[in-house]
A protein has these predicted regions:
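Active-site beta->alpha N-cap acidic-glycine motif
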Residues: 12-92
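The substrate-binding groove and active-site-proximal loops of carbohydrate-active enzymes
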Residues: 39-47, 70-72, 99-111, 136-139, ...
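C-terminal domain-boundary segment and adjacent tail
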Residues: 62, 158, 214-294
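Metal-dependent polysaccharide deacetylase catalytic core of the NodB/CE4 family, i.e.
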Residues: 63-144, 156, 161-168, 186, ...
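Active-site-adjacent pocket scaffolds in enzyme catalytic domains
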Residues: 128-131, 135-237
């Protein structure tokens, strides 16, 4: 069956549109690499972001999908033409912070400077108003909910920064699984990455390394459950480096880090092609910044 026809049929059978999101950072900026890759070495590292973004844009154009690109200010400053190309293709530009500092590594003042700087850079270069923010490594949790006050003051309208799971580097498993306002009515809207509730645990269902680890059929079933059982739009994310099995491999990485980062990179493109054909997708702002959410 022709891909476009298949996708139309799939959409007819799935009334909900899900949010497709990309965290725009390069391979050497991953938080798990921080102990081995000094921040001041970033400018001298071979960047692969442009080629990987082009691959993503081609896939989205083929599928006629618009997505949200949570972009580092650091990347935007160095690749302004790439950022403009993303925006010109009709995608939402959102912030991933400036220098990929985890929120818990900063106090309120430093965090404010980071999110204001990234928002300013992204808006100036893209010509779009930036409404959304995603914390590097989902680094907002119970101990630093003050970050939502800072984001609201800085002019953001929503965040996608809390992952309601248990993980050794991040997570707030007690948090709501769907849209909520951590600071109460009038506070910033938080849109968590998708999970499925099984027993007493939330099972990751929204991308990242779990999407590369789990069989595709299971990932598809989890997302379908969110749409059909929970009646909610799913939120899925991935990184450009996940489509790049040929990326440089820094020496000295711990075994667990190597497993998590490099697992099934060579299969990611094909899985994304299936995922984008099996579900309807759109930008975060178009799905969630509507009267029933905002």
């Amino acid at each position: 069956m022709h891909v476009a026809t298949q996708r139309r049929n799939n959409i007819l059978n799935n009334t909900l549109t899900n949010a497709l999101t990309i965290d725009v950072e390069d391979y050497f900026q991953v938080s798990a690499f921080a102990p081995l890759i000094a921040r001041d070495s970033w400018p001298s590292r071979p960047c692969r972001i442009e080629a990987n973004i082009e691959r993503i844009l081609l896939l989205l154009e083929t599928r006629q999908i618009h997505a949200t690109f949570f972009t580092l200010g650091w990347i935007a400053e160095r690749y302004p033409a790439m950022l403009r190309r993303i925006a010109a293709a009709g995608h939402e530009i959102a912030s991933h912070g400036h220098g990929h500092l985890r929120v818990w590594e900063q106090d309120a003042g430093a965090f404010r400077d980071d999110v204001v700087l990234s928002k300013t850079i992204l808006e100036q270069l893209s010509g779009q108003a930036v409404a959304g923010y995603r914390a590097p490594s989902f680094s907002i949790g119970a101990a630093n909910l003050w970050a939502f006050d800072v984001l609201l003051e800085a002019g953001y309208r929503y965040s996608s920064s809390i992952y309601p799971i248990r993980h050794d580097h991040y997570g707030m498993p007690e948090a709501p699984r769907f849209a909520w306002r951590p600071r109460g009515a009038g506070g910033l809207l938080e849109l968590p990455i998708s999970t499925v509730r099984l027993g007493r645990r939330n099972i990751p269902a929204g991308g990242g390394g779990y999407f590369r680890l789990l069989p595709y059929a299971l990932s598809r079933q989890l997302l379908r459950r969110i749409n059909a059982h929970d009646g909610q739009a799913g939120i899925f994310y991935f990184h450009p480096w996940e489509l790049d099995p040929g990326q440089p491999r820094p020496p000295g990485l711990p075994l667990k880090t190597r497993f998590r980062h490099y697992l099934n990179l060579g299969r990611m493109q094909a899985r994304l092609e299936r995922l984008t054909a099996d579900f309807a997708w759109d930008r975060m702002d178009r799905i969630f910044l509507k009267a029933d959410y905002a």
